Structure formats: structure tokens, C-alpha cells
A protein has these predicted regions:
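Active-site nucleophile-His-acid catalytic modules used for acyl/amide transfer and hydrolysis
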Residues: 76-114
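Short hydrophobic-aromatic micro-motifs
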Residues: 45-47
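Long, amphipathic alpha-helical surface segments
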Residues: 1-34, 41, 50, 54, ...
Length: 169
């Protein structure tokens, strides 16, 4: 059974980057307007997981955080995914959004060399969705938050697999 909330997200009419930011990246990353030290990643972080050029003491408004995220999603993640996965634009938007969020979280190099990317190149959409769930570990251990993000989410947030599968016929 397809998720009603994921179908609702897909029916919102948002473009790829806005859909990804609104329903996946921001809910899972959260928004911190003031830079903080990410002890796991060992890097200064701000907004919705932004690390590029962030320094201690940086502060951004909510509007600036959203603008920065959408710019990064488009330029640093969407465009590279289009280059490394020739069939990216042929995939349903639900798969594109899930892969874009995965790439933002794990990096384009890992996303482009993943089994999910391989399945997308084969146009095996259901297998691509399921392959994204493999990225649920940090430090060699399954992390409950990553497991939920990759799969069916939680009470407040849509998971990548949940959205991914909702767009398949």
C-alpha cells in the first residue's frame, strides 16, 4: 500500500529541488541557524546540514538557509547525479528526490558509485528504491535515525523509500 503522506507530497506540484528540500532534507536534517560543531562529522555545520564554508559564529536566517540548501541541492548534487546517472531524468520524480536526498547525505561520489545508481541506470526503479536503504550506517553500525530516513520515516517525517515507492506505477 502506498503511503498517503508520500502521495500527498508528490501531488504538491513542487519541482524536484523544492520537493526534496521540503519533504526530505529539511525534516531529516533540521535547521540550525547558528553554526554548531558536528562531533560525528568533525565539521562546523549550519542550516540543514550545510558544511561548505561554515565557520564558528556563522548565523543565517531561515530564508537564507532554504536558499542555500536549494542552491546546493541543484548545483552540487542534482547536476552531478544527472552526469553520473544517464537515466536520472527518466526516473519518476519520487526516485529522483530520494536519490537527491541520499546524495546530499552521503555525498555524490558514494551515491554515483552505489548499487542504487546502478539500478537507476538499468531503469530498475523498484530495485533502485530498495538499494538506497543500504545507507543506514555510521561508524560501521546501523543508526536508527538513518534507518528511518532511508526507509519509511517516522510519525513526523517521510522516509526516502516511502517517497520513492509512492511514485511508482
Amino acid at each position: 500500500m502506498k503511503s498517503k503522506r508520500a502521495k500527498g507530497a508528490l501531488a504538491s506540484g513542487l519541482g524536484l529541488v523544492a520537493l526534496t528540500a521540503t519533504y526530505l532534507t529539511v525534516p531529516w536534517e533540521g535547521v540550525e541557524n547558528k553554526a554548531y560543531w558536528d562531533s560525528l562529522g568533525k565539521v562546523w555545520t549550519v542550516c540543514a546540514g550545510e558544511t561548505k564554508g561554515v565557520k564558528k559564529g556563522d548565523y543565517y536566517s531561515d530564508a537564507k538557509c532554504l536558499q542555500m540548501l536549494q542552491t546546493r541541492l541543484e548545483n552540487d548534487f542534482h547536476k552531478p547525479l544527472q552526469k553520473c546517472i544517464a537515466t536520472f531524468d527518466a526516473a519518476p520524480i519520487s526516485i529522483q528526490a530520494s536519490m537527491l536526498d541520499l546524495s546530499y547525505n552521503i555525498g555524490t561520489g558514494a551515491a554515483c558509485s552505489s548499487s542504487a545508481a546502478k539500478r537507476m541506470r538499468e531503469k530498475n526503479w523498484p530495485a533502485a528504491c530498495n538499494a538506497m536503504t543500504l545507507f543506514n550506517r555510521a561508524g560501521g553500525r546501523v543508526v536508527e535515525g538513518l534507518k528511518k530516513r532511508r526507509e519509511y520515516g517516522d510519525a513526523q517525517r517521510i522516509g526516502e523509500l516511502e517517497l520513492c515507492l509512492a511514485g511508482l506505477k
